[in-house]
Amino acid sequence: MGSLSCSIIHLVLILQLQTFFVFSQNIRNGSVPVGESLTASESQQISSSWRSPSGDFAFGFRKIQPNDGFTLSIWFDKISDKTIVWHAQAVNTTTGLVPNGSKVTLTADGGLVIADPRGQELWRALSGGSVSRGRFTDDGNFVLFRDGSEDSDEVLWSSFENPTDTLLPNQNIEVGRNLSSRRTETSFKKGRFSLRLEDDGNLQLHSLNAETASESDIYSQYYESNTNDPNNPGIQLVFNQSGEIYVLQRNNSRFVVKDRDPDFSIAAPFYISTGFLLSTIIPKEARRIVGGCLLGLCRDNMCSPDDALGNMACGYNNICSLGNNKRPKCECPERFVLKDPSNEYGDCLPDFEMQTCRPENQTANSDVNLYEFITLEKTNWPFGDYESYANYDEERCKASCLSDCLCAAVIFGTNRDLKCWKKKFPLSHGERSPRGDSDTFIKVRNRSIADVPVTGNRAKKLDWLIIACSVLLGTSAFVIFDTSCSYRKTKKSKNMMKNQARDIGRTTATTTANELNLRVFTYGELAEATRDFTEELGRGAFGIVYKGYLEVAGGSEVTVAVKKLDRLDLDNEKEFKNEVKVIGQIHHKNLVRLIGFCNEGQSQMIVYEFLPQGTLANFLFRRPRPSWEDRKNIAVAIARGILYLHEECSEQIIHCDIKPQNILLDEYYTPRISDFGLAKLLLMNQTYTLTNIRGTKGYVAPEWFRNSPITSKVDVYSYGVMLLEIVCCKKAVDLEDNVILINWAYDCFRQGRLEDLTEDDSEAMNDMETVERYVKIAIWCIQEEHGMRPNMRNVTQMLEGVIQVFDPPNPSPYSTFTWSDESLSSDPVSLV
């Protein structure tokens, strides 16, 4: 849920005064003839542009972030921030951005048309028409005219009639139109706030569902003009040159939303709203900034909620307070970090393992010393309490939470009522106020007893022993073995245990692991369990996986998988530590579970749960093909698992080696992602990581070969390849047919031959609509330009049919890389 747009809706007012500077023009007096074009260029942050006659505004491609694509925009060109006031919102990509080399052309039949470097159309202003020319006006409006005179007012399209998140003077909002916020300052996806002139003439400001941003999925209403009288409804929201904003009604009466502004008398101010329609006056001279509430739409306290639905100004577990000019400020509590560091208004995640109520964990959880409270004075979370008590003092209130595994926080009323409210995670509508009469106490794991997963520089300073202990303390969900498990031990293993006990650090780790149902094994124990490593299950880039049998309490045996790292070198050491650290922190039904590990001398092994149905590769590449329904369910489940790694862990995790051989199936054919040996933790305060090339041929994203920053989009690429394998039941690289699957799949899609991908698969042939959707999603995922790939949340939503899937462009328009016969192998390798 929820991120508040850094810029809810911009309302920009300009006083047009004569300018004293003449700027170079790409077009003559704002007139753009048919055939003119602009190209997005990596060589400069702002590509070539067309300027309005005064030079106040520019039109062209803008690159917002170094590693992202471009957006077609209109912006202020005479201020240093180059503030964008319009952007092509309906770009036919999942990210809303277009790649380097894309071109916008003014055409006779489509008006403004964006095409990628291969000529694939990404967006157009008109579905049809006969455009004679375009004109870029001094008030920031780009207008397309029909054949004939401009004076005839035969306007086919204009940016003013298709607003995005900004309203300029002389720009009006018609019935049924709306302004929509951006997700963040640097994200051009639709945000969750909308200012709309409804069909009944009522002007309303809404908060929308953050996931869908749909106008039909309204959470909160902040304002309405009540101009919905059936006899005299509002017909237009007018914004004039005097700074006056009003709803024009049918009988020409005005409902004034904002009076004329006296500040319009100063030299050419720009009004830019941020936060909840709060204005900032930025003169062209940029010497001063003046703020205030715009439109009268602001409440006295925008942090104060009016209903329990949605999460208002700040995300879950985030605290809202009012700063200067009544602007909402959001801040994560101590021991919490932003889910998206670029969005201060978003959700906050705990940096510790939260208490659970699983029966097997109650012994540990019952120790109240494991937890403590952080205190947030004059802070309240008004919704979501599940129990309340009257006449409790503060200590009794906190004690009731410590002994309750459901309780995440308590709110204690400091007024005369002395009331205590218990809350569960996530906490919503957090508000801090100097006049608040409540204190919040959030329950966190006690640092003095157990280290917790951390982010930032502190994590880098922890040595391996401390990391291991903290990981073990974070894995109470892995309950395959009870601390009372008794293992058969040979005399050799007993002696090894005695020797091991002399190592204080190893003893500490073992004790910690046993307390939390995770085991530190000796080499002898695992050698006995695997019958001296005789039954091989599979091989990876750095190790071999063996089948093993461990005796548990009662004399029964449990089957396990033991991964033995077969070479001891720096990379192996790094892989071993990464795998234990990463898997020990996560628990999700589509991720493999860790049981324990061995780190004895030069022997490094990891013990997993055993999944009886083997790998997805064995499941897919067999005859007869698995059922189409099973394959669809597996595709969605794997996407959810990767989404969890990328967005829902306390630290973002990049797997780096997604492929069918690393997907295991349980007895119900539920997929679980395994082999995190190549995983890289991407700390929450970073945007990318540079690393050695890792992965498996056929699944490796192009940026690995270009010494480019590695982001979570490498997993998206690998998933796209695997999704094609799931659809076709063919390997990414087929040596027998000498076929590269991604090339063949795109050719079939481009030529309308999708049935070739599912030949002899009657079940899939009867569901070609889903087949086509999955193939299009896969092609989006394998785009060579990583900025064109969707994130895994978008992928999951597309798989589930929640969001539309547009036709993808050629995924490899620039690629000169070819697989040699020698390299046509799907064996796991480490690419250097």
From Swiss-Prot:
Residues 357-446 form the PAN domain. It is a single-pass type I membrane protein. Residues 25-461 are extracellular. GO terms for molecular function: ATP binding; calmodulin binding; carbohydrate binding; protein kinase activity; protein serine kinase activity; protein serine/threonine kinase activity; ubiquitin protein ligase binding. The active site is at 657 (proton acceptor). Glycans are attached at residues 29, 92, 100, 178, 240, 251, 361, 446. ATP binds at residues 537-545, 563. Keywords: ATP-binding, Cell membrane, Disulfide bond, EGF-like domain, Glycoprotein, Kinase, Lectin, Membrane, Nucleotide-binding, Receptor, Serine/threonine-protein kinase, Signal, Transferase, Transmembrane, Transmembrane helix. Residues 483-832 are cytoplasmic. Residues 1-24 form the signal peptide. Residues 622-638 are annotated as: CaM-binding. The chain crosses the membrane at residues 462-482. GO terms for cellular component: plasma membrane. Residues 37-157 form the Bulb-type lectin domain. PANTHER family: G-TYPE LECTIN S-RECEPTOR-LIKE SERINE/THREONINE-PROTEIN KINASE SD2-5, G-TYPE LECTIN S-RECEPTOR-LIKE SERINE_THREONINE-PROTEIN KINASE RLK1. This is G-type lectin S-receptor-like serine/threonine-protein kinase RLK1. It comes from Arabidopsis thaliana. The lineage of its organism: Eukaryota, Viridiplantae, Streptophyta, Embryophyta, Tracheophyta.
